[in-house]
From Swiss-Prot:
Chemical reaction(s) catalysed: cytidine(1402) in 16S rRNA + S-adenosyl-L-methionine = N(4)-methylcytidine(1402) in 16S rRNA + S-adenosyl-L-homocysteine + H(+)
Entry annotated with the keyword Methyltransferase: yes
Compartment(s) of residence: Cytoplasm
Taxonomic lineage of the native organism: Bacteria, Bacillati, Bacillota, Bacilli, Lactobacillales
Protein's UniProt name: Ribosomal RNA small subunit methyltransferase H
Function, as annotated: Specifically methylates the N4 position of cytidine in position 1402 (C1402) of 16S rRNA.
Signal peptide residues on this chain, from the entry's feature table: none
Keyword S-adenosyl-L-methionine set for record: yes
Family: Belongs to the methyltransferase superfamily. RsmH family.
GO cellular component, one term: cytoplasm
Residues bound to S-adenosyl-L-methionine: A35, G36, H37, D55, F84, D104, Q111
Keywords tagged on the record: Cytoplasm, Methyltransferase, rRNA processing, S-adenosyl-L-methionine, Transferase
């Protein structure tokens, strides 16, 4: 199990240390993955501290049970197999509030590297891309059943792909002849459509389409937005939230939500001080995103697009 679940932990110390860990605090890792962040966070806690770890992927949880065994024996870890859009409901089954929450929104390396999961455009595999293997919607369904207009919308909105219409049209043409069943078939369709000059720049030609389909299959942006709203509510005063994103769509959601919650509301004119009820809920710990160090980039190429944003809860909003 451990051999098949190797995952480089992106910005490990920056993300966890940014939470300002209290040894007896209660923390949530919303994206357990390879358990690197969880392991380092647990090493900062005493036996009165506790970590709740979310993942939709049973393989990730099974691996983490081995990696985190010393902390499990001390009763310091609770695993929750669920989408982090259920954050608030699941956490409130255990505790009313927490001291810190972290998100690493990248697909974990094992999911990318296991061919049968269908996340990678480098390996031929069935079109799947489900984070939760029991979920009903797969990449096969999107590619073979979504209308031309739906595909264009997904490719443009989630992949920011300028050849969205041409690719959707070619998918529509091919699937009338036979179902598109594998990642390799989809890659060839994309390569056939994108002009040679465009293929030679901007990374792999299938990158943006695969990202778009993965986001659609897992409703990643909807889940991210819903979960962040819940996370802010769950934090105690002085509790912190760390979020690592890997593409502009994810980062835009974090940036705009943190800005919304850290901005003073419209005030009546002429007030000498900002009244308590107008104070923002969050304080930004870093105005600009934290980026991986040169050392990390040399060790892990997948870190290159990562951005870390951290905020602290400074006020509870009155209902």
């Amino acid at each position: 199990m451990t051999e098949t679940f190797q995952h480089y932990t992106v910005m490990l110390k920056e993300t966890v240390d940014g939470l300002n860990i209290k040894p007896d605090g209660i923390y949530v890792d919303c994206t357990l993955g390879g358990a690197g962040h969880s392991e380092y966070l647990l090493s900062q806690l005493n036996t009165n501290g506790h970590l709740y770890a979310f993942d939709q992927d049973q393989k990730a949880i099974d691996h983490a049970k081995v990696r985190l065994a010393p902390y499990i024996e001390k009763g310091m870890v609770t695993f929750i197999k669920a989408n982090f859009r259920e954050l608030e409901a699941k956490i409130k089954e255990h505790v009313p509030q927490v001291d810190g929450i972290l998100y690493d929104l990248g697909v974990s390396s094992p999911q990318l590297d296991e061919a049968e999961r269908g996340f990678s455009y480098h390996q031929d595999a069935p079109l799947d891309m489900r984070m939760d293997q029991s979920a009903p919607l797969s990449a096969y369904d999107v590619v073979n059943e979504y209308s031309y207009n739906e595909l264009v919308k997904i490719f443009f909105r989630y992949g920011e792909e300028k050849f969205s219409k041409q690719i959707a049209r070619e998918i529509e043409r091919v699937r009338k002849i036979h179902p598109i069943q594998t990642t390799g078939e989809l890659v060839e369709i994309i390569k056939d459509v994108i002009p040679a000059p465009a293929r030679r720049k901007g990374g792999h030609p299938a990158k943006r389409i695969f990202q778009a389909i993965r986001i659609a299959v897992n409703d990643e942006l909807g889940a991210e937005e819903a979960s962040l709203e819940q996370a802010i509510r769950l934090l105690k005063i002085n509790g912190r939230i760390s979020v690592i994103t890997f593409h502009s769509l994810e980062d835009r959601i974090v940036k705009s939500m943190f800005k919304e919650y850290s901005t003073v509301q419209d005030l009546p004119p002429g007030l000498p001080v900002v009244p308590e009820e107008f104070q923002p809920e969050l304080k930004l710990i870093n105005r600009k995103p934290i980026l991986p160090s040169e050392e990390e980039l040399s060790e892990n190429n997948r870190s290159r697009s990562a951005k870390l944003r951290i905020a602290e809860k400074i006020r509870v909003k009155e209902e």
